[in-house]
C-alpha cells in the first residue's frame, strides 16, 4: 500500500483543496436520501483538510444524467445532508464550472466548504475530457481522490485531472486508502477457508472476476439471476428464468475450472418462482433444475439458504458481491436477507462489495456486523480481477 501517495504526506497548510468524493447515494421518489453511508465515509478526509486550515471544494457525480441539468440528479440534497452531519455550512454552487461555481470558489475562505453541482451535468466528465479536467483543477492547489467507487472509470475528475498536479500536490484520501488496502490484502492474504458469494443478475459483469477468484478461493457460491446460466450449462430446465445464452459455454468452463482446481462450486437447489415479476403474482417453491415452462426463478428458496449456510459455516473470509434474488421486491428479497444474516452469524472476516449488496445488508439490519462494506462495486470487482484502475494508477509513487 505504501506505493500510493497519501494525504498524510501533503503539505496542506491553509491551501485550497479539491476533493473528488463519491456521493452517488440512493434516493427515494421524493429525492430523500435513503442511505447516507457514502457521505459519512467522506468525512474523515474533509475534516482532516479543515483541521489543516484549508478551504475545501467537493465534487461528485450522482446517477447518470443524460443531457445536462436534471433536478433529480442535483447534489443540493447531498450538500444539505453533509452540512447536517458536519454541523457546519456547506456552500452549494448551482453549476460545475460556470460563473456560480467559480465566483463562490474564489471567495472561499479557510475553513469553508463548497460543493459544486453534479459533475456529470458536464458532458466532458464521462469522456475524460482534458479541457474540463483543467478547469476543475483550478478549484484547488491540491487534488485528493476519495472516491473508490469511480476509480475504475477514466473520467475527467478521476483520471485526466491528475495530469495537472505533480506528486507533491495529489494523493488518495483516507477512504480510498482504506478501500485499496483492504481489497489488496483480501486477495493476497485471505484467512482460509475463503468463500466467495457471487450474485446479481448477469454473468457478463462478473465473468472476469470469477476467473480470477477461482484460483484464490476454497469455495464459490453462485446465486441471483446469473445462477440460471450456470444451471442451463448443466442441462437443467430453467423455465423462463433469466438466461445469457451466449455465456452458457463460459459458465461451463468456470464449473470445469473449479473441478480442476478443487474448488467446490455451489448453485441454488431450489428457487422462488413466479410467472410474472409483480407484487400480485402467485409464487411457489420449485427445485432449481425443474422450473416449469412459463415460470421464472426470482429468488433462492429455503433449501438453497440451508445449503449455503452450511457451506459458509467454517469460513474465515467471506467476500459477497451481488444479491441472491430480485431483492427490490419484498417477496423476492428473503433469500438475500437470509444470506446476509447467515454471513454475519459466521466468525469470518466479511467483506461486502457493491451498491446493491450494501443495500441488502442495510435493509437486513446487518451493516454494523459486517467487517467491511466497500463503497465501490465495479471498482472492487476490477481490483479482484487484478486490473490497474485508472483512478489509482496516477496516485502511485513514481519509482
Swiss-Prot record:
<feature type="binding site">
    <location>
        <begin position="354"/>
        <end position="357"/>
    </location>
    <ligand>
        <name>ATP</name>
    </ligand>
</feature>
<dbReference type="Pfam" id="PF00162">
    <property type="entry name" value="PGK"/>
</dbReference>
<feature type="binding site">
    <location>
        <position position="38"/>
    </location>
    <ligand>
        <name>substrate</name>
    </ligand>
</feature>
<feature type="binding site">
    <location>
        <position position="153"/>
    </location>
    <ligand>
        <name>substrate</name>
    </ligand>
</feature>
<keyword id="KW-0324">Glycolysis</keyword>
<keyword id="KW-0547">Nucleotide-binding</keyword>
<feature type="binding site">
    <location>
        <position position="328"/>
    </location>
    <ligand>
        <name>ATP</name>
    </ligand>
</feature>
<dbReference type="InterPro" id="IPR036043">
    <property type="entry name" value="Phosphoglycerate_kinase_sf"/>
</dbReference>
<dbReference type="InterPro" id="IPR001576">
    <property type="entry name" value="Phosphoglycerate_kinase"/>
</dbReference>
<feature type="binding site">
    <location>
        <position position="206"/>
    </location>
    <ligand>
        <name>ATP</name>
    </ligand>
</feature>
<protein>
    <recommendedName>
        <fullName>Phosphoglycerate kinase</fullName>
        <ecNumber>2.7.2.3</ecNumber>
    </recommendedName>
</protein>
<dbReference type="GO" id="GO:0005524">
    <property type="term" value="F:ATP binding"/>
</dbReference>
<dbReference type="InterPro" id="IPR015824">
    <property type="entry name" value="Phosphoglycerate_kinase_N"/>
</dbReference>
<dbReference type="InterPro" id="IPR015911">
    <property type="entry name" value="Phosphoglycerate_kinase_CS"/>
</dbReference>
<comment type="similarity">
    <text>Belongs to the phosphoglycerate kinase family.</text>
</comment>
<dbReference type="GO" id="GO:0006094">
    <property type="term" value="P:gluconeogenesis"/>
</dbReference>
<comment type="subunit">
    <text>Monomer.</text>
</comment>
<dbReference type="GO" id="GO:0043531">
    <property type="term" value="F:ADP binding"/>
</dbReference>
<feature type="binding site">
    <location>
        <position position="297"/>
    </location>
    <ligand>
        <name>ATP</name>
    </ligand>
</feature>
<keyword id="KW-0067">ATP-binding</keyword>
<dbReference type="GO" id="GO:0005829">
    <property type="term" value="C:cytosol"/>
</dbReference>
<dbReference type="GO" id="GO:0006096">
    <property type="term" value="P:glycolytic process"/>
</dbReference>
<keyword id="KW-0418">Kinase</keyword>
<feature type="binding site">
    <location>
        <begin position="61"/>
        <end position="64"/>
    </location>
    <ligand>
        <name>substrate</name>
    </ligand>
</feature>
<comment type="pathway">
    <text>Carbohydrate degradation; glycolysis; pyruvate from D-glyceraldehyde 3-phosphate: step 2/5.</text>
</comment>
<keyword id="KW-0963">Cytoplasm</keyword>
<keyword id="KW-0808">Transferase</keyword>
<dbReference type="GO" id="GO:0004618">
    <property type="term" value="F:phosphoglycerate kinase activity"/>
</dbReference>
<feature type="binding site">
    <location>
        <begin position="22"/>
        <end position="24"/>
    </location>
    <ligand>
        <name>substrate</name>
    </ligand>
</feature>
<feature type="binding site">
    <location>
        <position position="120"/>
    </location>
    <ligand>
        <name>substrate</name>
    </ligand>
</feature>
Amino acid at each position: 500500500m505504501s506505493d500510493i501517495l497519501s494525504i498524510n504526506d501533503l503539505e496542506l497548510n491553509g491551501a485550497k483543496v479539491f476533493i473528488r468524493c463519491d456521493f452517488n447515494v440512493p434516493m427515494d421518489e421524493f429525492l430523500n436520501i435513503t442511505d447516507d453511508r457514502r457521505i459519512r465515509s467522506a468525512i474523515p478526509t474533509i475534516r482532516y483538510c479543515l483541521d489543516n486550515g484549508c478551504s475545501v471544494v467537493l465534487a461528485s457525480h450522482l446517477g447518470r444524467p443524460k443531457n445536462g441539468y436534471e433536478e433529480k440528479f442535483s447534489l443540493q440534497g447531498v450538500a444539505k445532508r453533509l452540512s447536517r452531519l458536519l454541523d457546519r455550512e456547506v456552500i452549494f454552487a448551482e453549476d460545475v464550472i460556470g460563473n456560480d461555481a467559480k465566483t463562490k470558489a474564489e471567495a472561499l475562505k479557510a475553513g469553508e466548504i463548497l460543493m459544486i453541482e453534479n459533475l456529470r451535468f458536464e458532458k466532458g466528465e464521462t469522456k475524460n475530457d482534458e479541457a474540463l479536467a483543467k478547469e476543475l483543477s483550478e478549484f484547488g492547489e491540491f487534488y485528493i481522490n476519495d472516491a473508490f467507487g469511480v476509480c475504475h472509470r477514466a473520467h475527467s475528475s478521476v483520471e485526466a485531472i491528475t495530469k495537472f498536479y505533480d506528486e507533491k500536490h495529489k494523493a488518495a484520501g483516507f477512504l480510498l486508502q482504506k478501500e485499496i488496502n483492504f481489497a489488496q490484502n483480501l486477495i493476497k492474504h485471505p484467512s482460509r477457508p475463503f468463500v466467495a458469494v457471487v450474485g446479481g443478475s448477469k454473468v457478463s459483469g462478473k465473468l472476469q472476476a470469477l476467473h480470477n477468484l477461482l484460483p484464490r478461493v476454497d469455495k464459490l457460491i453462485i446465486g441471483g439471476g446469473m445462477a440460471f446460466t450456470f444451471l442451463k450449462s448443466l442441462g437443467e430446465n430453467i423455465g423462463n428464468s433469466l438466461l445469457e445464452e451466449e455465456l452458457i459455454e463460459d459458465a461451463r468452463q468456470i464449473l470445469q475450472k473449479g473441478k480442476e482446481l478443487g474448488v467446490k462450486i455451489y448453485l441454488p437447489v431450489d428457487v422462488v418462482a413466479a410467472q410474472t415479476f409483480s407484487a400480485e403474482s402467485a409464487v411457489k417453491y420449485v427445485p432449481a433444475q425443474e422450473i416449469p415452462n412459463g415460470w421464472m426463478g426470482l429468488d433462492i428458496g429455503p433449501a438453497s439458504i440451508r445449503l449455503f449456510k452450511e457451506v459458509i459455516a467454517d469460513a474465515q473470509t467471506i467476500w459477497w458481491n451481488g444479491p441472491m434474488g430480485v431483492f427490490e421486491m419484498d417477496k423476492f428479497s428473503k433469500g438475500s436477507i437470509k444470506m446476509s444474516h447467515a454471513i454475519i452469524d459466521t466468525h469470518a472476516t466479511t467483506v461486502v462489495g457493491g451498491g446493491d449488496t450494501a443495500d441488502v445488508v442495510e435493509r437486513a439490519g446487518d451493516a454494523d456486523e459486517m467487517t467491511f462494506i466497500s463503497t465501490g462495486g465495479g471498482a472492487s470487482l476490477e481490483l479482484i480481477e487484478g486490473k490497474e484502475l485508472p483512478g489509482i494508477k496516477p496516485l502511485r509513487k513514481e519509482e
